[in-house]
Amino acid sequence: MSVRTQSSEEPAETVHRAGFACFVGRPNAGKSTLTNALVGQKVAITSNRPQTTRHTVRGIVHREDAQLILVDTPGLHKPRTLLGERLNDVVRTTWAEVDVIGFCLPANEKLGPGDRFIAKELAGIRKTPKVAIVTKTDLVDSKTLAEQLIAIDQLGKELGIAWAEIVPVSATANQQVDLLADLLTPLLPEGPALYPEGDLTDEPEQVMVAELIREAALEGVRDELPHSIAVVVEEMLPREDRPADKPLLDIHANVYIERPSQKGIIIGPKGKRLKDVGIKSRTQIEALLGTPVFLDLHVKVAKDWQRDPKQLRRLGF
Protein backbone atom coordinates (compact mmCIF):
# COMPACT_ATOMS: atom_id res chain seq x y z
CA MET A 1 0.00 0.00 0.00
CA SER A 2 1.38 3.39 -1.02
CA VAL A 3 0.09 6.21 1.18
CA ARG A 4 1.28 9.72 0.36
CA THR A 5 2.37 12.23 2.97
CA GLN A 6 4.07 15.60 2.49
CA SER A 7 7.58 14.22 2.99
CA SER A 8 7.20 11.84 0.02
CA GLU A 9 6.43 14.68 -2.42
CA GLU A 10 8.10 14.35 -5.80
CA PRO A 11 9.49 17.17 -7.99
CA ALA A 12 6.98 18.74 -10.38
CA GLU A 13 7.16 17.97 -14.08
CA THR A 14 8.07 20.74 -16.51
CA VAL A 15 5.29 19.98 -19.03
CA HIS A 16 1.99 21.83 -18.70
CA ARG A 17 -1.10 19.76 -18.02
CA ALA A 18 -4.80 20.60 -18.00
CA GLY A 19 -7.82 18.47 -17.27
CA PHE A 20 -10.80 17.58 -15.15
CA ALA A 21 -10.92 15.83 -11.79
CA CYS A 22 -14.09 14.92 -9.98
CA PHE A 23 -14.62 14.19 -6.31
CA VAL A 24 -17.13 11.47 -5.51
CA GLY A 25 -18.28 9.98 -2.27
CA ARG A 26 -21.37 9.51 -0.21
CA PRO A 27 -23.16 12.62 1.06
CA ASN A 28 -21.24 14.68 3.64
CA ALA A 29 -17.84 13.13 2.85
CA GLY A 30 -16.17 16.56 2.61
CA LYS A 31 -16.16 16.96 -1.18
CA SER A 32 -17.33 20.58 -1.31
CA THR A 33 -15.01 21.69 1.51
CA LEU A 34 -12.09 20.07 -0.30
CA THR A 35 -13.03 21.76 -3.59
CA ASN A 36 -13.11 25.17 -1.87
CA ALA A 37 -9.75 24.52 -0.14
CA LEU A 38 -8.02 23.57 -3.40
CA VAL A 39 -9.46 26.54 -5.32
CA GLY A 40 -8.69 28.91 -2.44
CA GLN A 41 -12.16 30.46 -2.54
CA LYS A 42 -15.72 29.35 -1.89
CA VAL A 43 -17.15 27.94 -5.14
CA ALA A 44 -19.27 25.12 -3.66
CA ILE A 45 -21.71 25.42 -0.78
CA THR A 46 -20.98 23.44 2.35
CA SER A 47 -23.24 22.31 5.16
CA ASN A 48 -23.25 19.60 7.80
CA ARG A 49 -26.45 18.41 6.13
CA PRO A 50 -25.94 15.58 3.60
CA GLN A 51 -26.98 16.16 -0.03
CA THR A 52 -26.30 19.91 -0.17
CA THR A 53 -24.58 19.86 -3.57
CA ARG A 54 -27.03 19.66 -6.48
CA HIS A 55 -25.14 21.09 -9.46
CA THR A 56 -21.71 20.06 -10.73
CA VAL A 57 -19.53 23.02 -9.80
CA ARG A 58 -16.32 23.53 -11.71
CA GLY A 59 -13.68 24.99 -9.42
CA ILE A 60 -10.49 25.95 -11.24
CA VAL A 61 -7.03 25.54 -9.69
CA HIS A 62 -4.32 27.55 -11.49
CA ARG A 63 -0.73 26.31 -11.11
CA GLU A 64 2.46 27.07 -13.02
CA ASP A 65 2.61 23.50 -14.30
CA ALA A 66 -1.11 22.78 -14.65
CA GLN A 67 -4.71 23.84 -14.63
CA LEU A 68 -6.86 21.49 -12.58
CA ILE A 69 -10.62 21.82 -13.09
CA LEU A 70 -12.52 20.31 -10.17
CA VAL A 71 -16.01 19.00 -10.72
CA ASP A 72 -17.87 18.81 -7.42
CA THR A 73 -20.72 16.34 -7.83
CA PRO A 74 -23.67 15.56 -5.55
CA GLY A 75 -23.12 12.64 -3.18
CA LEU A 76 -24.08 9.32 -4.76
CA HIS A 77 -26.86 7.57 -2.84
CA LYS A 78 -29.86 5.28 -3.27
CA PRO A 79 -32.50 7.70 -4.61
CA ARG A 80 -35.92 8.12 -2.96
CA THR A 81 -37.23 10.87 -5.25
CA LEU A 82 -37.03 11.97 -8.87
CA LEU A 83 -34.58 14.67 -7.74
CA GLY A 84 -32.43 11.92 -6.19
CA GLU A 85 -32.43 9.99 -9.47
CA ARG A 86 -31.49 13.15 -11.40
CA LEU A 87 -28.62 13.84 -8.98
CA ASN A 88 -27.27 10.30 -9.39
CA ASP A 89 -27.48 10.65 -13.19
CA VAL A 90 -25.41 13.84 -12.91
CA VAL A 91 -22.73 11.93 -10.97
CA ARG A 92 -22.46 9.07 -13.46
CA THR A 93 -22.39 11.41 -16.46
CA THR A 94 -19.59 13.38 -14.80
CA TRP A 95 -17.52 10.24 -14.15
CA ALA A 96 -17.57 9.42 -17.86
CA GLU A 97 -16.15 12.82 -18.80
CA VAL A 98 -13.28 13.45 -16.36
CA ASP A 99 -9.56 12.58 -16.47
CA VAL A 100 -9.23 11.46 -12.84
CA ILE A 101 -11.67 10.50 -10.07
CA GLY A 102 -11.05 11.30 -6.40
CA PHE A 103 -13.02 9.03 -4.04
CA CYS A 104 -13.57 10.91 -0.76
CA LEU A 105 -13.84 8.78 2.39
CA PRO A 106 -14.03 10.46 5.83
CA ALA A 107 -11.32 9.37 8.28
CA ASN A 108 -13.75 9.58 11.20
CA GLU A 109 -16.32 7.09 9.85
CA LYS A 110 -15.75 3.38 9.21
CA LEU A 111 -16.36 2.18 5.66
CA GLY A 112 -20.05 1.41 5.24
CA PRO A 113 -22.54 0.12 2.67
CA GLY A 114 -22.68 3.56 0.99
CA ASP A 115 -18.90 3.54 0.42
CA ARG A 116 -19.00 -0.01 -0.95
CA PHE A 117 -21.89 0.90 -3.27
CA ILE A 118 -19.82 3.72 -4.79
CA ALA A 119 -16.61 1.65 -4.89
CA LYS A 120 -18.40 -1.08 -6.87
CA GLU A 121 -19.61 1.56 -9.36
CA LEU A 122 -16.04 2.90 -9.63
CA ALA A 123 -14.66 -0.60 -10.21
CA GLY A 124 -16.67 -0.70 -13.43
CA ILE A 125 -14.85 2.37 -14.79
CA ARG A 126 -11.64 0.80 -16.02
CA LYS A 127 -9.62 3.48 -17.80
CA THR A 128 -9.95 6.51 -15.50
CA PRO A 129 -7.30 6.74 -12.73
CA LYS A 130 -8.76 6.73 -9.21
CA VAL A 131 -7.29 8.42 -6.13
CA ALA A 132 -8.57 7.50 -2.67
CA ILE A 133 -8.78 10.71 -0.60
CA VAL A 134 -9.14 10.22 3.15
CA THR A 135 -10.84 13.42 4.34
CA LYS A 136 -11.34 15.02 7.78
CA THR A 137 -8.05 13.66 9.14
CA ASP A 138 -8.01 16.44 11.77
CA LEU A 139 -10.89 14.65 13.54
CA VAL A 140 -9.01 11.40 14.29
CA ASP A 141 -5.83 10.17 15.97
CA SER A 142 -2.99 8.47 14.07
CA LYS A 143 -4.14 4.93 15.01
CA THR A 144 -7.67 5.49 13.66
CA LEU A 145 -6.25 7.06 10.49
CA ALA A 146 -3.89 4.10 9.94
CA GLU A 147 -6.81 1.66 10.32
CA GLN A 148 -8.85 3.62 7.76
CA LEU A 149 -5.96 3.70 5.27
CA ILE A 150 -5.55 -0.08 5.56
CA ALA A 151 -9.32 -0.62 5.15
CA ILE A 152 -9.37 1.52 1.97
CA ASP A 153 -6.37 -0.32 0.55
CA GLN A 154 -8.13 -3.65 1.25
CA LEU A 155 -11.37 -2.40 -0.33
CA GLY A 156 -9.47 -1.59 -3.52
CA LYS A 157 -7.87 -5.05 -3.64
CA GLU A 158 -11.21 -6.74 -2.95
CA LEU A 159 -12.98 -4.96 -5.83
CA GLY A 160 -10.06 -4.84 -8.27
CA ILE A 161 -9.49 -1.08 -8.01
CA ALA A 162 -5.82 -0.10 -8.37
CA TRP A 163 -5.65 3.20 -6.47
CA ALA A 164 -3.28 5.60 -8.24
CA GLU A 165 -2.71 7.16 -4.81
CA ILE A 166 -4.13 7.03 -1.28
CA VAL A 167 -3.90 10.51 0.25
CA PRO A 168 -4.94 11.61 3.76
CA VAL A 169 -6.03 15.30 3.86
CA SER A 170 -7.78 17.82 6.07
CA ALA A 171 -9.37 20.67 4.11
CA THR A 172 -10.40 22.61 7.23
CA ALA A 173 -6.92 22.37 8.79
CA ASN A 174 -5.24 22.80 5.37
CA GLN A 175 -3.18 19.63 5.83
CA GLN A 176 -1.83 17.99 2.65
CA VAL A 177 -4.22 19.94 0.38
CA ASP A 178 -1.31 21.19 -1.78
CA LEU A 179 0.11 17.66 -1.86
CA LEU A 180 -3.21 16.37 -3.21
CA ALA A 181 -3.02 18.92 -6.06
CA ASP A 182 0.58 17.80 -6.71
CA LEU A 183 -0.53 14.16 -6.97
CA LEU A 184 -3.59 14.84 -9.15
CA THR A 185 -1.58 16.93 -11.65
CA PRO A 186 0.51 14.10 -13.23
CA LEU A 187 -2.72 12.18 -13.89
CA LEU A 188 -4.01 14.95 -16.18
CA PRO A 189 -3.33 15.02 -19.94
CA GLU A 190 -0.69 17.38 -21.31
CA GLY A 191 -2.14 20.54 -22.81
CA PRO A 192 -2.65 24.31 -22.50
CA ALA A 193 -4.92 25.99 -19.95
CA LEU A 194 -8.65 25.57 -20.67
CA TYR A 195 -9.84 28.63 -18.71
CA PRO A 196 -8.40 32.18 -18.48
CA GLU A 197 -6.04 33.02 -15.60
CA GLY A 198 -8.07 34.39 -12.70
CA ASP A 199 -11.26 32.41 -13.41
CA LEU A 200 -12.08 30.30 -10.34
CA THR A 201 -15.36 28.76 -11.51
CA ASP A 202 -17.60 28.67 -14.58
CA GLU A 203 -20.77 28.84 -12.50
CA PRO A 204 -22.97 31.80 -13.55
CA GLU A 205 -23.19 34.48 -10.84
CA GLN A 206 -26.95 33.99 -10.44
CA VAL A 207 -26.47 30.28 -9.71
CA MET A 208 -23.75 31.02 -7.13
CA VAL A 209 -25.95 33.66 -5.47
CA ALA A 210 -28.85 31.19 -5.29
CA GLU A 211 -26.54 28.58 -3.76
CA LEU A 212 -25.29 31.02 -1.10
CA ILE A 213 -28.89 31.81 -0.14
CA ARG A 214 -29.68 28.08 0.03
CA GLU A 215 -26.62 27.48 2.20
CA ALA A 216 -27.82 30.13 4.68
CA ALA A 217 -31.36 28.68 4.59
CA LEU A 218 -30.03 25.18 5.39
CA GLU A 219 -28.48 26.27 8.69
CA GLY A 220 -30.43 25.18 11.74
CA VAL A 221 -33.44 23.58 10.04
CA ARG A 222 -34.81 20.19 10.97
CA ASP A 223 -33.61 17.04 9.22
CA GLU A 224 -36.56 16.66 6.87
CA LEU A 225 -36.35 20.16 5.45
CA PRO A 226 -32.96 20.56 3.65
CA HIS A 227 -33.99 18.46 0.65
CA SER A 228 -37.20 20.49 0.32
CA ILE A 229 -35.39 23.82 -0.16
CA ALA A 230 -34.65 25.25 -3.61
CA VAL A 231 -33.69 28.85 -4.43
CA VAL A 232 -34.22 30.72 -7.69
CA VAL A 233 -32.82 34.21 -8.32
CA GLU A 234 -35.56 35.90 -10.34
CA GLU A 235 -33.74 39.19 -10.99
CA MET A 236 -30.29 40.67 -10.41
CA LEU A 237 -29.93 44.29 -11.60
CA PRO A 238 -27.88 47.37 -10.62
CA ARG A 239 -30.08 49.99 -8.89
CA GLU A 240 -30.73 52.89 -11.26
CA ASP A 241 -29.91 56.52 -10.39
CA ARG A 242 -27.07 55.55 -8.00
CA PRO A 243 -23.81 57.55 -8.01
CA ALA A 244 -20.89 55.65 -9.57
CA ASP A 245 -19.03 55.53 -6.24
CA LYS A 246 -22.09 54.12 -4.39
CA PRO A 247 -23.46 51.26 -6.51
CA LEU A 248 -26.19 48.94 -5.22
CA LEU A 249 -27.20 45.60 -6.71
CA ASP A 250 -30.86 44.62 -6.33
CA ILE A 251 -31.36 40.85 -6.02
CA HIS A 252 -34.87 39.37 -5.93
CA ALA A 253 -34.95 35.68 -5.02
CA ASN A 254 -37.55 33.07 -4.09
CA VAL A 255 -36.96 30.29 -1.57
CA TYR A 256 -39.15 27.33 -2.56
CA ILE A 257 -40.38 24.65 -0.16
CA GLU A 258 -42.70 21.70 -0.81
CA ARG A 259 -45.51 22.12 1.74
CA PRO A 260 -47.30 25.08 3.33
CA SER A 261 -46.44 23.68 6.78
CA GLN A 262 -42.72 24.21 6.02
CA LYS A 263 -43.18 27.92 5.42
CA GLY A 264 -43.22 28.74 9.13
CA ILE A 265 -39.95 26.84 9.68
CA ILE A 266 -38.14 28.94 7.07
CA ILE A 267 -39.70 32.27 8.02
CA GLY A 268 -39.47 31.74 11.80
CA PRO A 269 -41.27 33.65 14.59
CA LYS A 270 -42.04 37.19 13.37
CA GLY A 271 -39.87 36.58 10.30
CA LYS A 272 -36.66 36.28 12.36
CA ARG A 273 -35.26 33.19 10.61
CA LEU A 274 -35.79 34.56 7.11
CA LYS A 275 -34.18 37.83 8.20
CA ASP A 276 -31.14 35.90 9.51
CA VAL A 277 -30.94 33.98 6.21
CA GLY A 278 -30.97 37.32 4.37
CA ILE A 279 -28.24 38.86 6.53
CA LYS A 280 -25.93 35.80 6.34
CA SER A 281 -26.35 35.27 2.61
CA ARG A 282 -26.08 38.97 1.78
CA THR A 283 -22.68 39.15 3.52
CA GLN A 284 -21.44 36.18 1.45
CA ILE A 285 -22.93 37.56 -1.79
CA GLU A 286 -21.29 40.97 -1.26
CA ALA A 287 -17.94 39.25 -0.68
CA LEU A 288 -18.42 37.16 -3.84
CA LEU A 289 -19.52 40.01 -6.13
CA GLY A 290 -17.55 42.86 -4.53
CA THR A 291 -20.51 45.25 -4.40
CA PRO A 292 -23.19 46.30 -1.87
CA VAL A 293 -26.39 44.29 -2.26
CA PHE A 294 -30.08 44.80 -1.50
CA LEU A 295 -31.53 41.31 -1.09
CA ASP A 296 -35.28 40.78 -1.39
CA LEU A 297 -36.28 37.26 -0.26
CA HIS A 298 -39.68 35.58 -0.53
CA VAL A 299 -40.76 32.08 0.52
CA LYS A 300 -43.04 30.19 -1.88
CA VAL A 301 -44.59 26.72 -1.99
CA ALA A 302 -43.90 24.48 -5.01
CA LYS A 303 -45.90 21.40 -4.03
CA ASP A 304 -43.83 18.18 -3.96
CA TRP A 305 -41.34 19.69 -6.43
CA GLN A 306 -38.77 16.91 -5.90
CA ARG A 307 -41.15 14.39 -7.51
CA ASP A 308 -42.55 16.61 -10.27
CA PRO A 309 -40.58 16.71 -13.57
CA LYS A 310 -42.11 20.07 -14.62
CA GLN A 311 -41.27 21.73 -11.30
CA LEU A 312 -37.76 20.24 -11.34
CA ARG A 313 -37.13 21.81 -14.75
CA ARG A 314 -38.51 25.16 -13.59
CA LEU A 315 -36.22 25.11 -10.55
CA GLY A 316 -33.17 24.31 -12.68
CA PHE A 317 -32.71 20.55 -12.27
From Swiss-Prot:
GTP binds at residues 25-32, 72-76, 135-138. Belongs to the TRAFAC class TrmE-Era-EngA-EngB-Septin-like GTPase superfamily. Era GTPase family. GO terms for molecular function: GTP binding; GTPase activity; ribosomal small subunit binding; rRNA binding; small ribosomal subunit rRNA binding. An essential GTPase that binds both GDP and GTP, with rapid nucleotide exchange. Plays a role in 16S rRNA processing and 30S ribosomal subunit biogenesis and possibly also in cell cycle regulation and energy metabolism. It comes from the Bacteria. Its main location: cytoplasm. It comes from Streptomyces coelicolor (strain ATCC BAA-471 / A3(2) / M145). InterPro entries: G_ERA_dom, GTP-bd, GTPase_Era-like, KH_dom-like_a/b, KH_dom_type_2, KH_sf_prok-type, P-loop_NTPase, Small_GTP-bd. GO terms for biological process: ribosomal small subunit assembly. Residues 169-171 are annotated as: G5. Residues 51-55 are annotated as: G2. Residues 135-138 are annotated as: G4. This is GTPase Era. It is found in: Cytoplasm; Cell membrane.
